[in-house]
């Protein structure tokens, strides 16, 4: 009987996701016991500024990965969209379970859809990716940054001067909220999701063959291949958190992956969007990035990063 220490952030969503994975793993192998160790990450500690200003990818995983490398914990469950495109040496994503709904949702006062929101409506989001795409569709909107867990954000919509907020459908679903709280599901055609949105990443040490063997039984091949394409695109674009970047892949029954990538300026005035097809997920991701870079997306990323550095200097 082996006792597995599972690292998790303290947030309700993180704990819910971790407990869901543990339940699945216990069903697959009753010989393992699991114990959760709570870990506070940098992203949890800093709540008064936008995520893009706090630092690059890895805000919600770095401390957890350090605990894994030191042997303090054995594994962790992350939201895939929080994962950096390159993992520390010695760690690996051992498994990606079946993806939840990858879409973003709009929740508004008076149940008004995005197109029906009044001129200059205030929309809450903490994501540059969401705000850039919203402003592309509705340049009149006022984007107001909003942080905190799902319950906190829903409360702020009620009590503060937001007309609407944007959240991930997967988070709402995992927290037990029913679809009737949602005003509108935003189609990927209008609001492309974050890379890996709706998917979980189960991470462990690459040397832990016992856990890797167990994880393989929870892995979903469709999710793994499509998310791999998205992450290859993100890695090749070197976007980080400071630039609005999105990627979403689908796969047909013949194994052909269709990846749509997007890079935008924060004001939504410049948007590069491309769709690439192929059977090799890594190659599809790289090709999408190469096509977009050639058209100017890489230059836009470099410009946005430079402007941010100049602003902070």
UniProtKB/Swiss-Prot annotation:
The modification S-(dipyrrolylmethanemethyl)cysteine is found at residue 241. InterPro entries: HemC, Porphobilin_deaminase_cofac_BS, Porphobilin_deaminase_N, Porphobilinogen_deaminase_C, Porphobilinogen_deaminase_C_sf. It comes from the Bacteria. The keyword Translocase does not apply. Pathway: Porphyrin-containing compound metabolism; protoporphyrin-IX biosynthesis; coproporphyrinogen-III from 5-aminolevulinate: step 2/4. SUPFAM superfamilies: Periplasmic binding protein-like II (SSF53850), Porphobilinogen deaminase (hydroxymethylbilane synthase), C-terminal domain (SSF54782). Binds 1 dipyrromethane group covalently. GO terms for biological process: protoporphyrinogen IX biosynthetic process. It catalyses: 4 porphobilinogen + H2O = hydroxymethylbilane + 4 NH4(+). One of its GO terms (cellular component) is cytoplasm. Keywords: Porphyrin biosynthesis, Transferase. GO terms for molecular function: hydroxymethylbilane synthase activity. Its cofactor is dipyrromethane. Its EC number is 2.5.1.61. Tetrapolymerization of the monopyrrole PBG into the hydroxymethylbilane pre-uroporphyrinogen in several discrete steps. Belongs to the HMBS family. Monomer. The porphobilinogen subunits are added to the dipyrromethane group. This is Porphobilinogen deaminase. The gene is hemC.
């Amino acid at each position: 009987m082996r006792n597995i220490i599972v690292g998790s952030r303290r947030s309700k969503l993180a704990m819910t996701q971790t407990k869901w994975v543990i339940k699945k793993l216990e069903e697959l192998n009753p010989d393992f016991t699991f114990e959760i160790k709570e870990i506070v990450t940098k992203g949890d500690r800093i709540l008064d500024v936008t995520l893009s200003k706090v630092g690059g990818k890895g805000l919600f995983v770095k401390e957890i990965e350090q605990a894994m490398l030191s042997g303090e914990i054995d594994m962790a469950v992350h939201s895939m969209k929080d994962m950096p495109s390159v993992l520390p040496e010695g760690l690996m994503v051992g498994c990606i379970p079946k993806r939840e709904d990858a879409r973003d949702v709009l929740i508004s006062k008076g149940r008004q859809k995005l197109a029906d929101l009044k001129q200059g409506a205030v929309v809450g989001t903490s994501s540059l990716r969401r705000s850039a795409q919203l402003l592309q569709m509705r340049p009149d909107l006022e984007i107001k940054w909003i942080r905190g867990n799902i319950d906190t954000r829903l409360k702020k919509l009620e009590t503060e001067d937001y007309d609407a907020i944007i959240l991930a459908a997967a988070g709402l679903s995992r927290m037990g909220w029913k679809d009737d709280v949602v005003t509108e599901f935003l189609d990927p055609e209008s609001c492309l999701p974050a890379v890996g949105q709706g998917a979980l990443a189960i991470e462990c040490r690459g040397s832990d063959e016992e856990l890797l063997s167990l994880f393989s039984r929870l892995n979903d091949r469709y999710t793994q291949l499509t998310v791999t394409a998205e992450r290859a695109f993100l890695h090749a674009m070197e976007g980080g958190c400071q630039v609005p970047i999105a990627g979403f892949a689908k796969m047909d029954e013949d194994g052909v992956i269709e990846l749509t990538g997007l890079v935008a300026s924060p004001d939504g005035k410049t948007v590069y969007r491309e769709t690439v097809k192929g059977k090799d997920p890594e190659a599809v991701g790289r090709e999408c990035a190469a096509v977009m870079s050639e058209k100017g997306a890489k230059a836009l990323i470099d410009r946005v990063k430079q402007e941010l550095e100049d602003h902070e200097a």
